[in-house]
């Protein structure tokens, strides 16, 4: 984005899954519905002559469902219903250009011929969301998360505003977690790092309409509760398709359908829809 650009996004998400809004919280035996909105504000600026941006992300809404647990004798099951509503965990995200993404004015941005680019990503998620240690399913996570990554990719076209622009982007990243000091029916829960790589292929069909195909691969995230491993390391792949329409330079809407394509027994499950409205000024 050109330096000085502001984006407001209002996102609606509905999904059937076995986790909260964060897939790293997947619980085997859970059957949950997540209905949330997300407010995001992004500001583009120059850092050491490179294009950079900061974003603040605030989710809100409800997660509800039921969890099937093993009974006290191990040979029967117990089903517990649960719901959580309110605000989710707030995130602050920074993306910083390193190669191929100079800071530009709007006029320079329109004339710039893109190519390869490499950047750095850093995100902090704070435990601000609704959380109750008597519930297995919560909107908040009661722990900090720290994500770092190195997005890189190629843009093929005469400019970023080209009506036939194609972009290929990869985002390798790792997320680290602090301990949850009030997990369900326990005293402490730690979680190993989660490793992730995203791939995005986006093509403009004209100045207004574009589509994107998305893939992710994830592994890690095993938890340890009160010093005992939960043996729930997660490995999964996910995918999705997005179609977007720009009604003007200031306003656009996109719709995404996506879900889990494959995974082990501890992995998140399900699929969902997302609608994203964008206002740029």
Where in this protein do the model-derived segments appear?
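Short loop/turn motifs that connect adjacent beta-strands in outer-membrane beta-barrel proteins
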Residues: 1-4, 46-52, 100-117, 157-166, ...
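Surface-exposed strand-loop-strand hairpins of Gram-negative outer-membrane beta-barrel proteins
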Residues: 14-36, 80, 136-137
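Residues on the lipid-exposed face of transmembrane beta-strands in outer-membrane beta-barrel proteins
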Residues: 10, 39-43, 92-98, 122, ...
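Outer membrane beta-barrel transmembrane domains
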Residues: 19, 180-281
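Transmembrane beta-barrel strands of outer-membrane/channel proteins
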Residues: 8-16, 54-60, 118-126, 166-176, ...
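Residues that define the transmembrane beta-barrel architecture of outer-membrane proteins
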Residues: 4, 31-37, 50, 81, ...
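Outer-membrane beta-barrel translocator domains and adjoining extracellular loop/strand segments
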Residues: 18-25, 65-73, 105-110, 130-137, ...
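Long, hydrophobic/aromatic-enriched structural stretches that serve as scaffold segments
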Residues: 33-102
